[in-house]
């Protein structure tokens, strides 16, 4: 019974003095929240500034790329179908009928030229 009275008295004291600190805690929480929002805002502004700089660099690079006409000619690699309906073979390869799989697909393939 004595322990229950002690715990009840501690509960009453904690409730009474806990309310006194509530205003201080709320002010501290407001300060913390405001500081976090300031930091988030500053971080967001820095990120936006960095993004704008990257976009500017990217646009200048794309302009240089467009000026150079850098598109490469497409060609077929080794063991790729070639012929009138397909693009040409890359350098070092020739479009030939092969016995291995060309007869199955009924089309010539890009292969290394035979030495003979």
UniProtKB/Swiss-Prot annotation:
Glycans are attached at residue 85. The presence of a 'disulfide through disulfide knot' structurally defines this protein as a knottin. GO terms for molecular function: sodium channel inhibitor activity; toxin activity. InterPro entries: Toxin_22 (IPR012627). Coiled coil: none annotated. The lineage of its organism: Eukaryota, Metazoa, Ecdysozoa, Arthropoda, Chelicerata. It is found in: Secreted. Ion channel inhibitor. It holds the Pfam family Toxin_22. Residues 1-20 form the signal peptide. This is U16-barytoxin-Tl1f. Belongs to the neurotoxin 14 (magi-1) family. 06 (ICK-Trit) subfamily. GO terms for cellular component: extracellular region. Residues 21-74 form a propeptide. Disulfide bonds join 75-90, 82-95, 89-110. It comes from Trittame loki. Keywords: Cleavage on pair of basic residues, Disulfide bond, Glycoprotein, Ion channel impairing toxin, Knottin, Secreted, Signal, Toxin. Expressed by the venom gland.
